[in-house]
């Protein structure tokens, strides 16, 4: 019923993802599933989360038992003093859990594969920010600044290539955030922004372009934008922009 995915970088952080109910089986059918190593472990047991810096819990809110188990798993993880815990719930309704919840509304996606691709992008964006050394480093403390003491999270990733790729990728991420919450531009006091690209395709100019696009979008110009930049040579000419906001 339960499986745990763990991706470890001893130098920077330990990020783990727990699956509740059928979500593990669906995740494993996706092409990107092999990017994470599966571990045996029950996310409802605190021992599974010991030593974890950043934890994700994925559940399907359309299964009532899964919602209850998600809440239990959150408590189990929190009992270990985990630095950051992000539950991800596939649900049309907003449900409260004792941790900052990222809700994935299935009605906003084309199908199951699209839903899980979005979840994968959420996990990967946080992993890239906190666990991979970058051109301009963000770290665990930056993720904590946005997530801790929050009830809800908004997280989106945009990608583009070619002319004005940075601005286009930023706008794609913004559009996804707006789809999650029509008032996304005004809900947070701190925004975490990460720009990823190949070394040949990413400079301070591109990063500044993205930052200005996000700044112009935000209602409150006093909102703190914590930004970083990561190098990923596999992206070639693609620029990836990830935005995290806590409510």
Regions found by a protein language model. Name each.
Residues 1-247:
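Tubulin/FtsZ superfamily GTPase core signature
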